[in-house]
Design a protein with these regions (language model features):
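N-terminal beta-strand motif that seeds the catalytic metal site of vicinal oxygen chelate
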Residues: 1-18, 67-70, 121-126
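Short glycine-enriched loop/turn motifs at secondary-structure junctions
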Residues: 1-3, 61-65, 98-99
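A structural feature recognizing the 12-helix transmembrane core of secondary solute carriers
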Residues: 2, 38-40, 63, 85-86
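Core segments of cupin and vicinal oxygen chelate
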Residues: 8-47, 51-53
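Short hydrophobic/aromatic beta-strand element in the GNAT-like acyltransferase core
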Residues: 46, 69, 104-106
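Mid-chain, well-packed structural core segment of small domains
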Residues: 68-85, 89-90
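Vicinal oxygen chelate
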Residues: 82-126
Length: 126
Protein backbone atom coordinates (compact mmCIF):
# COMPACT_ATOMS: atom_id res chain seq x y z
CA UNK A 1 0.00 0.00 0.00
CA UNK A 2 1.15 3.54 -0.63
CA UNK A 3 1.85 5.93 2.23
CA UNK A 4 0.80 9.60 2.08
CA UNK A 5 3.91 11.76 2.46
CA UNK A 6 3.05 15.13 0.92
CA UNK A 7 0.34 17.73 1.59
CA UNK A 8 -0.13 20.81 -0.57
CA UNK A 9 -2.02 23.84 0.73
CA UNK A 10 -3.30 26.44 -1.71
CA UNK A 11 -2.26 29.87 -0.46
CA UNK A 12 -2.57 33.48 -1.55
CA UNK A 13 1.17 34.20 -1.34
CA UNK A 14 3.63 31.28 -1.11
CA UNK A 15 6.40 33.66 -0.01
CA UNK A 16 4.35 35.07 2.90
CA UNK A 17 3.03 31.63 3.84
CA UNK A 18 6.57 30.19 3.72
CA UNK A 19 7.72 32.85 6.19
CA UNK A 20 4.74 32.03 8.44
CA UNK A 21 5.41 28.27 8.39
CA UNK A 22 9.18 28.72 8.76
CA UNK A 23 8.51 30.59 11.99
CA UNK A 24 6.05 27.96 13.30
CA UNK A 25 8.04 24.90 12.22
CA UNK A 26 11.47 26.22 13.14
CA UNK A 27 12.95 25.35 9.75
CA UNK A 28 13.37 26.96 6.36
CA UNK A 29 11.77 25.74 3.13
CA UNK A 30 14.02 23.66 0.87
CA UNK A 31 12.52 25.27 -2.22
CA UNK A 32 10.90 28.66 -2.82
CA UNK A 33 9.62 30.55 -5.83
CA UNK A 34 6.95 33.22 -6.33
CA UNK A 35 4.37 30.45 -6.89
CA UNK A 36 5.50 27.57 -4.64
CA UNK A 37 7.37 26.73 -1.44
CA UNK A 38 8.32 23.31 -0.08
CA UNK A 39 9.20 22.18 3.44
CA UNK A 40 10.64 18.75 4.20
CA UNK A 41 9.63 17.77 7.72
CA UNK A 42 10.48 14.86 10.01
CA UNK A 43 10.55 11.40 8.45
CA UNK A 44 10.49 12.94 4.96
CA UNK A 45 6.95 14.31 5.15
CA UNK A 46 6.57 17.27 2.79
CA UNK A 47 4.44 20.41 3.09
CA UNK A 48 3.92 22.35 -0.12
CA UNK A 49 2.49 25.86 -0.39
CA UNK A 50 1.18 26.51 -3.91
CA UNK A 51 -0.25 29.79 -5.13
CA UNK A 52 -4.00 29.42 -5.48
CA UNK A 53 -3.68 31.79 -8.44
CA UNK A 54 -1.42 29.46 -10.45
CA UNK A 55 -2.29 25.92 -9.28
CA UNK A 56 -3.03 23.56 -12.17
CA UNK A 57 -5.67 22.42 -12.61
CA UNK A 58 -7.39 25.38 -10.95
CA UNK A 59 -8.88 24.64 -7.53
CA UNK A 60 -12.34 25.88 -6.58
CA UNK A 61 -11.83 25.79 -2.80
CA UNK A 62 -9.06 27.02 -0.55
CA UNK A 63 -8.61 26.93 3.21
CA UNK A 64 -10.80 25.44 5.92
CA UNK A 65 -11.65 22.15 4.19
CA UNK A 66 -9.26 20.05 6.27
CA UNK A 67 -6.64 20.28 8.98
CA UNK A 68 -2.88 20.13 9.12
CA UNK A 69 -2.27 18.16 12.32
CA UNK A 70 0.90 18.54 14.37
CA UNK A 71 1.69 16.11 17.20
CA UNK A 72 3.60 17.29 20.27
CA UNK A 73 5.34 15.35 23.04
CA UNK A 74 2.88 15.86 25.92
CA UNK A 75 -0.16 17.77 27.20
CA UNK A 76 2.01 20.59 28.56
CA UNK A 77 3.43 21.10 25.05
CA UNK A 78 -0.11 21.55 23.71
CA UNK A 79 -0.68 24.36 26.20
CA UNK A 80 2.77 25.88 25.62
CA UNK A 81 2.30 25.84 21.83
CA UNK A 82 -1.11 27.47 22.23
CA UNK A 83 0.42 30.23 24.38
CA UNK A 84 3.25 30.73 21.86
CA UNK A 85 0.92 30.90 18.86
CA UNK A 86 -1.50 33.20 20.69
CA UNK A 87 1.45 35.49 21.39
CA UNK A 88 2.29 35.43 17.68
CA UNK A 89 -1.24 36.62 16.88
CA UNK A 90 -2.67 33.46 15.29
CA UNK A 91 -6.45 33.29 15.23
CA UNK A 92 -7.68 30.55 17.56
CA UNK A 93 -10.75 28.45 16.79
CA UNK A 94 -10.47 26.19 19.82
CA UNK A 95 -8.68 26.73 23.11
CA UNK A 96 -6.74 23.79 24.57
CA UNK A 97 -9.23 21.13 25.55
CA UNK A 98 -9.42 17.41 26.23
CA UNK A 99 -11.35 15.48 23.58
CA UNK A 100 -11.85 11.72 23.17
CA UNK A 101 -8.49 11.28 21.42
CA UNK A 102 -6.32 13.63 23.47
CA UNK A 103 -5.45 17.20 24.40
CA UNK A 104 -5.77 19.60 21.46
CA UNK A 105 -6.38 23.08 20.12
CA UNK A 106 -7.06 24.55 16.67
CA UNK A 107 -5.63 27.73 15.10
CA UNK A 108 -5.82 29.29 11.64
CA UNK A 109 -2.98 30.12 9.28
CA UNK A 110 -3.13 33.34 7.20
CA UNK A 111 -5.10 31.52 4.46
CA UNK A 112 -7.63 30.08 6.96
CA UNK A 113 -6.19 26.56 6.89
CA UNK A 114 -6.92 24.84 10.18
CA UNK A 115 -3.87 23.89 12.24
CA UNK A 116 -4.55 21.29 14.94
CA UNK A 117 -1.95 20.63 17.62
CA UNK A 118 -2.51 17.54 19.74
CA UNK A 119 -1.10 15.03 22.15
CA UNK A 120 -2.95 11.68 22.14
CA UNK A 121 -4.10 10.13 25.38
CA UNK A 122 -2.35 6.81 26.08
CA UNK A 123 -5.50 4.80 25.40
CA UNK A 124 -5.85 6.58 22.03
CA UNK A 125 -2.26 5.66 21.10
CA UNK A 126 -3.17 1.99 20.92
Amino acid sequence: MTTPNFVILYVDSPEKSAAFYASLLGRQPVETSPTFALFVLDKGFKLGLWSRHTVEPAAAASGGGGELVLAVEDAAAVDATHADWTGRGLAMLQAPTDLDFGRTFVALDPDNHRLRVYWPFEEAQG
